Swiss-Prot record:
Its main location: secreted. This is Trypsin-3. It catalyses: Preferential cleavage: Arg-|-Xaa, Lys-|-Xaa. Residues 49-274 form the Peptidase S1 domain. The keyword Amino-acid biosynthesis does not apply. It comes from the Eukaryota. GO terms for biological process: digestion; proteolysis. GO terms for cellular component: extracellular region. The gene is TRYP3. It comes from Anopheles gambiae. Constitutive trypsin that is expressed 2 days after emergence, coinciding with host seeking behavior of the female. Residues 23-48 form a propeptide.
Length: 275
């Protein structure tokens, strides 16, 4: 009798564990369609831009590497001497003490200056399931000294529009999807902005995009941000218009990159960082 009860309890336990594992697997599959923003430490973050070219950090002196326990995790942009803007999915659920930024270097793993993060402010409306309001402000422990390779980026006005087809530059250390291209040096790609309705249609199967997002890329694909570029800058004429956020694959035909639209949170950025 006792042995039968034990057998039944073991069977129930096995079923419960199997169900829990299935739920975890389903959750992981549900985000694999958007691999650019898969968070660490559960998933690896890559190191290169797709279809781009090497640049010196002096060409994008606002670019930073967000480091998680001394390893490159995401990109970011200098707002002023104390604040950095990145993507909320890069910092959510992480302690500020685990984060630092490397500035003034074309290499994410060496050179320049490393400054620790003192405080993180994700946008209060950030939605981890839809990646809406994908913005995070990071306050640094010490003030930056500006130079030819460390400079704040200009910001748009609140709700300032970006015309369709505007050529942008996106930079970072994300995945190039090419074994022939080194992951050590900062890279960039020029991509045009995409009509909002066209981008919504492209991503209709995953719920489309919101007004807090903008898209950039070529219909034929070939150039895009990728894993490891998340949080980095999308810039037009020296002005930060987007933050690398998500997308279906990287540089895939018909699927432009999706960026968090900076102009919609301009007032929030100013109120919290003074930038």
């Amino acid at each position: 009798m006792i042995s039968n009860k034990i057998a039944i309890l073991l069977a129930v336990l096995v079923v419960a564990v199997a169900c829990a594992q299935a739920r975890v697997a389903l959750k992981h599959r549900s985000v694999q369609a958007l691999p650019r923003f898969l968070p660490r430490p559960k998933y690896d973050v890559g190191h290169r831009i797709v279809g781009g070219f090497e640049i010196d950090v002096s060409e994008t002196p606002y670019q930073v590497s967000l480091q998680y326990f001394n390893s490159h995790r995401c990109g970011g942009s200098v707002l002023n001497s104390k604040w950095i803007l990145t993507a909320a999915h890069c910092t959510v659920n992480l302690q500020p003490s685990s984060l630092a930024v490397r500035l003034g270097s074309s290499r994410h793993a060496s050179g320049g200056t490393v400054v620790r993060v003192a405080r993180v402010l994700e946008h209060p409306n950030y939605d981890d399931s839809t990646i809406d309001y994908d913005f995070s402000l990071m306050e640094l422990e010490s003030e930056l000294t500006f130079s030819d390779v460390v400079q704040p980026v200009s910001l748009p006005d609140q709700d300032e529009a970006v015309e369709d087809g505007t050529m942008t530059i996106v930079s970072g250390w994300g995945n190039t999807q090419s074994a022939a291209e080194s992951n050590a040096i900062l890279r960039a790609a020029n991509v045009p902005t995409v009509n909002q309705k066209e981008c919504t249609i492209a991503y209709s199967s995953s719920g489309g995009i919101t007004d807090r997002m903008l898209c950039a890329g070529y219909k034929r694909g070939g150039k895009d941000a990728c894993q490891g570029d998340s949080g980095g800058p999308l810039v037009v004429d020296g002005k930060l218009v987007g933050v690398v956020s998500w997308g279906f694959g990287c540089a895939m035909p018909g699927y432009p990159g999706v960026y968090a639209r900076v102009a919609v949170v301009r007032d929030w950025v100013r109120e919290n960082s003074g930038a």
